[in-house]
Amino acid sequence: FFQDRFEGMELIYSLEEKTLFTGGAVKMALSRCRDENVFIVNGDTFFDVDLAAMAQRHQATGAVLTVATKEMEHFSRYGTVQFDDSGRIIAFREKQPCQHGAINGGIYLLKRNALDAISQEKFSFEQDYMEAQVDSVPFFAFPSSGYFIDIGIPEDYAKAQEDFQTR
């Protein structure tokens, strides 16, 4: 841990006493945040995204949720994010073989109060919030061409170790 500060930023930790799933954990962490918009980052991916530009887009669109997306070719281990010409997300598709598409890169910018209406303590951020609300809440994509790697499997973890030595 970085204690309570890192490079001038105040750090506040949110520790789960019991399993809350992704949505419950995010909701609990949001309750400790003070800013109106909060970045959420998956712990098992690395995605080089311009966070300042993502924040500007989030504000400009009036999004409740902005999702960093990455265009990929020939994949099956990720679901896809479909969005219209304005960047408004219109659908999240489950994992299936895909020739070309945008994936959820695991970086989000979310309004702090976005999950307040969810009464469940344990829920999935992706399924019970994102997929359930995509038709009624303004979610926007933030496409990025930055380096992306998911280290959730041993082969990609090893690849990340090699890649970071040369970066």
Regions found by a protein language model. Name each.
Residues T61-E71:
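A short, conserved acidic/glycine-rich loop-to-beta-strand motif
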Residues N37-F39, F46, A52-Q59, M72-F75, ...:
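Catalytic-core segments of class I nucleotidyltransferases/pyrophosphorylases
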Residues F1-N42, L51-A53, F83, A117:
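Conserved N-terminal catalytic core of the sugar/cofactor nucleotidyltransferase
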Residues F21-G24, M28, R57, V67, ...:
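Residues within well-formed alpha-helices
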Residues L15, N42, V67-T69, P143:
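Short loop/edge segments at beta-strand edges and connector loops
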Residues F2, L15-E17, T69-K70, R93-Q96:
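Short, well-ordered turn and helix-capping elements at secondary-structure junctions
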Residues I12, V64, P138:
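Residue-level detector of anion-binding/catalytic polar loops
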